[in-house]
A protein has these predicted regions:
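A short, internal acetyl-CoA/4′-phosphopantetheine-binding micro-motif in the GNAT/acyltransferase core
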Residues: 150-159, 188
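Conserved GNAT acetyl-CoA-binding A-motif
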Residues: 177-187
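Conserved beta-strand in the GNAT
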Residues: 109, 115-124, 148
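Conserved acyl-donor/pantetheine-binding loop and adjacent beta-alpha core of acyl/acetyltransferases
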Residues: 124-148, 159
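Conserved acetyl-CoA pyrophosphate-binding loop and the N-cap/start of the following alpha-helix
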Residues: 158, 162-170
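Conserved active-site alpha-helix within GNAT-family acetyltransferase domains
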Residues: 165-166, 189-205
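A short beta-loop-alpha structural element at the N-terminal edge
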Residues: 54-69
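Conserved GNAT-fold acetyl-CoA-binding loop/helix
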Residues: 75-96
């Protein structure tokens, strides 16, 4: 998984299940409009948070280079590429084939005042017939109902500023717009910042 210890399954609202290996967060979009309203996000305007300073835009071919550069940074590489260079190449293959083989994944570049500072994505779990059952212990029988998310902040000076929380809110808003009902995420237990970010966005422990 993009964010990949001891496993806990989190559901919204306030349901806790114990599992085996990884922290696995599940956000169920039940009463989602109420949650979004409280969080200050409009699903119809999910890009308009924080005075329009933080935006997400679809990844383009010319963005692959900066994404590759971010993946090579140690603090990102250890989470996104736990299997080393093979894993990095798999990421690059994914974004390069995002309109064909990986059409069910939506990749974005995150901008702060028009400066590219990060990356995020969501994927429709319906199309992952092996990974989702093996990793989350569930099957998905309908398109556009269950999604997985991931994100990174590629520029160090933007770490620790609450931008990850904004990114997750935007992804939740995007998924809600297309009728998603459940969102999955799988941060490593050592990735404390990502865990806090998910919890602060309604993935409740």
């Amino acid at each position: 998984c993009d964010l990949c210890g001891h496993e806990l399954l989190y559901k919204y609202p306030l349901v806790l299940l114990y599992c085996i290996e990884n922290y696995i967060f599940v956000f169920q979009i039940v009463g989602f409009m109420e949650f979004i309203k409280e969080a200050g996000v409009s699903p119809q305007k999910s890009m308009d948070i924080k005075n329009d300073k933080i935006t997400i835009k679809p990844l383009r071919d010319k963005d692959v280079g900066i994404f590759s550069k971010w993946l090579a940074k140690e603090y990102i590489y250890k989470w996104f590429c736990p299997d080393g260079e093979e894993h990095k190449m798999a990421w690059l293959d994914e974004v390069n084939n995002r309109n064909t083989q990986y059409h069910y994944m939506k990749h974005f570049i995150v901008y702060y005042n028009d400066k590219a500072i990060g990356f995020c994505l969501y994927l429709d779990c319906y199309f992952e017939k092996e990974y989702i059952p093996e990793h989350y212990g569930k099957t998905v029988d309908e398109k556009e109902t269950v999604f997985e998310i991931g994100y990174l902040i590629g520029e160090e000076e933007y770490l620790g500023k609450g931008i990850g929380k904004i990114i997750v809110k935007k992804l939740i808003g995007e998924i809600a717009e297309i009728g998603g009902k459940e969102i999955l995420a799988d941060p490593d237990e050592a990735n404390v910042l990502s865990i806090r970010t998910l919890l602060s966005n309604g993935f409740v422990k």
